[in-house]
Amino acid sequence: MAVSASLVKELRERTGLGMMECKKALAETDGDIDAAIENLRKASGLKAAKKADRTAAEGVVAAKVADDGSYGVLVEVNSETDFVARDAGFLAFVDSVVEKAFSAKAADVAAVNDEAMESTRQALVQKIGENIGIRRVSLIEADGGLVGAYVHSNNRIAVMVQLANGGSVELAKDVAMHIAAVNPQVVNPEDMPEEVVNKEKDIIKAQPDMEGKPEQIVEKMMTGRINKFLKENSLVEQPFVKDPEITVGALVKKEGASVVSFSRFEVGEGIEKKEEDFAAEVAAQVAASKGNA
C-alpha cells in the first residue's frame, strides 16, 4: 500500500528518525504505525551494536550533590562528536543518568545501566546515529564531613571534593574549581603511588646533568627533584589558583577543614580517538551504502 505523507510525518515526530527510514518501516507494516515503531525498536539493538565499535570520545560530564552535602555523584557520558554532545536529546539522556546515579547512590556504571537505561540508550543511538555510552560513575560520601562539586562551563570537566572537620560549600567548590584547572594527582605528597615515584626517579636518573656525578650528589639532586615533583602534583601543596600567595592546604586549614579525597572527570581522557581523513570517511560511507543495497 502507498504510505501517506501524514503517517510518515507522525512516525518521524514520534521516533525522531529520518524520513526514508520511517517510510520504509511503514511500508513494511502496511501503514500500521504501532507495528512500525515496534519493528524499529527491535531493530535498534542491531543498529546500536553496529555502531559500538566506533570511538565515543566526546560527550559531557555532570555532577549532582545532595543539598546537605552528604554525598554526590559524577558521571561521564560519551558521544562520537562534539555536535551530538550539544544535542538536546543527548543532554536529556545525561540528565537521566545523573538522576539515576544520584537516587541509587551508584558507585559504578553497572548500578546505573539497568535494562530500562540500556533500552533508552539504544533508542538514542538509533535516533542520533552515533555510538553513545555511559563511561564512568563516581560516588563520594561525606562520612560526617562535606561534599562539594564544580562543573566547568563547557561541561567537559567536573570535580567532586570531600572535606572533613569543617569548611563550607563555597570552600569545597573553590577547591574543586582549583582541581579542575590544575589537575593534581593526589591530595597529599604521601598519597603518591610508589610506582609513580619510582618511575619519576628513573626519568630523573636518565637526565644528562646526572651523568658522571658522585653518588651522594646524585642522591641529593634526586631528593630535591622528587620533592619538587610531589609538591607540584599534590593538591595541598599547590598555590591556590584564585590566590597564588596561599596554598590549597593553607586555605583549607584556615577554615579548620581538611581535604579527604577528590574525583575529577575530564571528557575523553584516556580514550584513544581514531583519526580518519575526510576522503577515507566518505569512502567508508559509500562502501556501507553499497553493502546495504
From Swiss-Prot:
GO terms for molecular function: translation elongation factor activity. GO terms for cellular component: cytoplasm. The keyword Protein biosynthesis applies. It comes from the Bacteria. SUPFAM superfamilies: Elongation factor Ts (EF-Ts), dimerisation domain, UBA-like. Keywords: Cytoplasm, Elongation factor, Protein biosynthesis. Residues 81-84 are annotated as: Involved in Mg(2+) ion dislocation from EF-Tu. Signal peptide: none annotated. Its main location: cytoplasm. Pfam families: EF_TS. It is found in: Cytoplasm. InterPro entries: EF-Ts_dimer_sf (IPR036402), Transl_elong_EFTs/EF1B (IPR001816), Transl_elong_EFTs/EF1B_dimer (IPR014039), Transl_elong_Ts_CS (IPR018101), UBA-like_sf (IPR009060). Belongs to the EF-Ts family. Associates with the EF-Tu.GDP complex and induces the exchange of GDP to GTP. It remains bound to the aminoacyl-tRNA.EF-Tu.GTP complex up to the GTP hydrolysis stage on the ribosome. This is Elongation factor Ts. It comes from Teredinibacter turnerae (strain ATCC 39867 / T7901).
